[in-house]
From Swiss-Prot:
InterPro entries: PP2C, PP2C_BS, PPM-type-like_dom_sf, PPM-type_phosphatase-like_dom. Its cofactor is Mg(2+); Mn(2+). Mn(2+) 2 binds at D60, D442, D497. Residues 26-506 form the PPM-type phosphatase domain. The modification Omega-N-methylarginine is found at R22. Keywords: Acetylation, Cytoplasm, Hydrolase, Lipoprotein, Magnesium, Manganese, Membrane, Metal-binding, Methylation, Myristate, Phosphoprotein, Protein phosphatase, Repeat. Mn(2+) 1 binds at D60, G61. This is Protein phosphatase 1G. The modification Phosphothreonine is found at T122. Its main location: cytoplasm. It is an enzyme of class 3 (hydrolase). It comes from Macaca fascicularis (Crab-eating macaque). SUPFAM superfamilies: PP2C-like. The modification Phosphoserine is found at S183, S528.
Length: 547
C-alpha cells in the first residue's frame, strides 16, 4: 500500500479509563502510525454512550483518513438517533446506523466536510485556481504582444529563427519563408497542438498530524485519544505531486508569417498528392487496400474489447476525479455493552475477540472478497475479484463504509452492492468466564492470530508494577504494538501497517492512575473540542491504503 517512511513512527497515543457505575469495566488503548506515511486509523472509547451502554470501536481507513475520522466523530450519535436504539433493539440499531452514515457520505455537505478533513480543495477552490491560472496566461500574452510590437523586423526574424541577411529560403512552391518554430508567437494566437497544459494534481499535500479517535475518559501520553485533539505526528512525507504552477507557456503564432506558412502548407499537400499517384503507378492495388482495412477493423475491435475490460477493472481515481467517500473508506467494528449483553457489529477486516476462559472467541468475521458469500454478491453487482483478492483489481475488502465508487449499481439496494456497509452482528451474554475483549485493526491481526493476542494479553494482565499496582492496560497494548511492528519494510508488508488496539476488561481493576467517575469528560464536550481543533488543522495529506 504505497510508500513507507524511512524509519517507523513509533510515537504512541495511549489512554486508560473506567466505566460508568452501572458498567464497572476498565479499558486501555494505544495507536501507532508505524511505517506508514500517514495515520488513517481512528477509534471510539465511550464508557457512557448512555447511562446503561458503553461503546468501543476501531475504524481502519483506506485511501485517506477522512472517512475513519468522520465515523469516529458522528457514528456514536447516529447510533443513538436510530429508532431501534430508542426501542432497545441494539442489533437493528447498529445495522441501520452503519447504512445511514454510509448514505450520508454521498451528500454534498458531507463531501465538503470530508474534503476539509482530507485537506483536498473543494470545487470552488479548484475554480478559483483555474481562473487565476487563466489570468496569468492572459497577462503573459499581453506582455509578449507589447514587447514584439516595439521590435524591428530584423529582431523578429532573429527571434523566430530567420536570418535577415540571407535570401529567402527555397521552397517547393518557389516562394515563402518556410514554417516558423512553434515555440512562441507574435500575436498570441495559440497553435493547434500547443494549448496550455497542466500537470494533473493528486492533491497529496504534505503529511499533517492526525488524531486517532475519540475517548471520553482519562488518558495519558500525547492524549490524542480525546476527541478532536491532534494525535501523533505522522512524519514529513513531503509533497507527492508536481506543482500546478509549473506550466508550459502558451504557444502563439506570428501574423507576420501566416502567408508564408499557408504557401508552405500548399506545397506539402501537392507533394502528398504526387506520392499517392506514384504509389498507384507502382502497382498498389485496391485489393491490397481492402485487406489492410480488414486488418484495421480487427485491430479496432480488439482495442474496443480491451477498453471495455479496462473499464470494468477501473479503480477509484482512474477517472481523473478524486472524491472523498468515493475513492476512500473505512472498516468499522463497533462493540456495545449493555448489562450482560455484548453486541458487536463489523464491516471489513478489523476484529473483535473475547477471552473466554483463556480461549479466543471471535466476535466478528473478516470480510474478504474471495469468501463465498462475498464473492456471490460482488458478481451479482457486476464486479470481479482478481487472483490477488481485489474487487475489480482495487479494494481488498468486500465490506466498508464509504468506497462509493463500488456502489453505483442503481438496480440494487445498498446492502447488495459490490462493497456493502451492512455489518454482520454477533451477540454474547457475558459470564464470569469472559475476562476481557480486544478490538483492533488488521495491523495487529495480520501479524498475530486471535489466540496469540489473547495469550499475549493473558500473560501480562495480572502483572504488577514496582508499587504493587496492576499494569495499566494501555501499557500492555503498547507492548503489543511493538511486538507486531516489523523491523523493516523488506517483507510483504506484514507489520508495516497503522496499528490501533483497545483492551476492555469486563471487571474493574485496581490501578492507581485511573480517574474516578467525576474526572470524566462528557461526549458533548469532547465533540465541541474536536470541532475547534479540526478548524485549525486543515493541512492534511491524502494517503492511499489500497493494499
Amino acid at each position: 500500500m504505497g510508500a513507507y517512511l524511512s524509519q517507523p513512527n513509533t510515537v504512541k497515543c495511549s489512554g486508560d479509563g473506567v466505566g460508568a457505575p452501572r458498567l464497572p469495566l476498565s479499558y486501555g488503548f494505544s495507536a501507532m502510525q508505524g511505517w506508514r506515511v500517514s495515520m488513517e486509523d481512528a477509534h471510539n472509547c465511550i464508557p457512557e454512550l448512555d447511562s446503561e451502554t458503553a461503546m468501543f470501536s476501531v475504524y481502519d481507513g483506506h485511501g485517506g483518513e477522512e472517512v475513519a475520522l468522520y465515523c469516529a466523530k458522528y457514528l456514536p450519535d447516529i447510533i443513538k438517533d436510530q429508532k431501534a436504539y430508542k426501542e432497545g433493539k441494539l442489533q437493528k440499531a447498529l445495522e441501520d446506523a452503519f447504512l445511514a452514515i454510509d448514505a450520508k457520505l454521498t451528500t454534498e455537505e458531507v463531501i465538503k466536510e470530508l474534503a476539509q478533513i482530507a485537506g483536498r480543495p473543494t470545487e470552488d477552490e479548484d475554480e478559483k485556481e483555474k481562473v487565476a491560472d487563466e489570468d496569468d496566461v492572459d497577462n503573459e500574452e499581453a506582455a509578449l504582444l507589447h514587447e514584439e510590437a516595439t521590435m524591428t523586423i530584423e529582431e523578429l526574424l532573429t527571434r523566430y529563427g530567420q536570418n535577415c541577411h540571407k535570401g529567402p529560403p527555397h521552397s517547393k512552391s518557389g516562394a515563402g519563408t518556410g514554417e516558423e518554430p512553434r515555440s512562441q508567437g507574435l500575436n498570441g494566437e495559440a497553435g493547434p497542438e500547443d494549448s496550455t497544459r497542466e500537470a494533473p494534481s493528486q492533491e497529496n499535500g504534505p503529511t499533517a498530524k492526525a488524531y486517532t479517535g475519540f475517548s471520553s475518559n482519562s488518558e495519558r501520553g500525547t492524549e490524542a485519544g480525546q476527541v478532536g485533539e491532534p494525535g501523533i505526528p505522522t512524519g514529513e512525507a513531503g509533497p507527492s505531486c508536481s506543482s500546478a504552477s509549473d506550466k508550459l507557456p502558451r504557444v502563439a503564432k506570428s501574423k507576420f508569417f501566416e502567408d508564408s506558412e499557408d504557401e508552405s502548407d500548399e506545397a506539402e499537400e501537392e507533394e502528398e498528392d504526387s506520392e499517392e499517384c506514384s504509389e498507384e503507378e507502382d502497382g498498389y492495388s485496391s485489393e491490397e487496400a481492402e485487406n489492410e482495412e480488414d486488418e484495421d477493423d480487427t485491430e479496432e475491435a480488439e482495442e474496443d474489447d480491451e477498453e471495455e475490460e479496462e473499464e470494468e477493472m477501473m479503480v477509484p481515481g482512474m477517472e481523473g476525479k478524486e472524491e472523498p467517500g468515493s475513492d476512500s473508506g473505512t472498516t468499522a467494528v463497533v462493540a456495545l455493552i449493555r448489562g450482560k449483553q455484548l453486541i458487536v457489529a463489523n464491516a471489513g477486516d478489523s476484529r473483535c475477540v473475547v477471552s473466554e476462559a483463556g480461549k479466543a472467541l471471535d466476535m466478528s468475521y473478516d470480510h474478504k472478497p474471495e469468501d463465498e458469500v462475498e464473492l456471490a454478491r460482488i458478481k451479482n453487482a457486476g464486479g470481479k475479484v482478481t487472483m490477488d483478492g481485489r474487487v475489480n483489481g482495487g479494494l481488498n475488502l468486500s465490506r466498508a463504509i464509504g468506497d462509493h465508487f463500488y456502489k453505483r449499481n442503481k438496480n440494487l439496494p445498498p446492502e447488495e452492492q459490490m462493497i456493502s456497509a451492512l455489518p454482520d452482528i454477533k451477540v454474547l451474554t457475558l459470564t464470569d468466564d469472559h475476562e476481557f475483549m480486544v478490538i483492533a485493526c488488521d495491523g495487529i491481526w495480520n501479524v498475530m492470530s486471535s489466540q496469540e493476542v489473547v495469550d499475549f494479553i493473558q500473560s501480562k494482565i495480572s502483572q504488577r508494577d514496582e508499587n504493587g499496582e496492576l499494569r495499566l492496560l494501555s501499557s500492555i497494548v503498547e507492548e503489543l504494538l511493538d511486538q507486531c511492528l516489523a523491523p523493516d519494510t523488506s517483507g510483504d508488508g506484514t507489520g508495516c501497517d497503522n496499528m490501533t488496539c483497545i483492551i476492555i476488561c469486563f471487571k474493574p481493576r485496581n490501578t492507581a492512575e485511573l480517574q474516578p467517575e467525576s474526572g470524566k469528560r462528557k461526549l458533548e464536550e469532547v465533540l465541541s473540542t474536536e470541532g475547534a481543533e479540526e478548524n485549525g488543522n486543515s493541512d492534511k495529506k491524502k494517503k492511499a491504503k489500497r493494499d
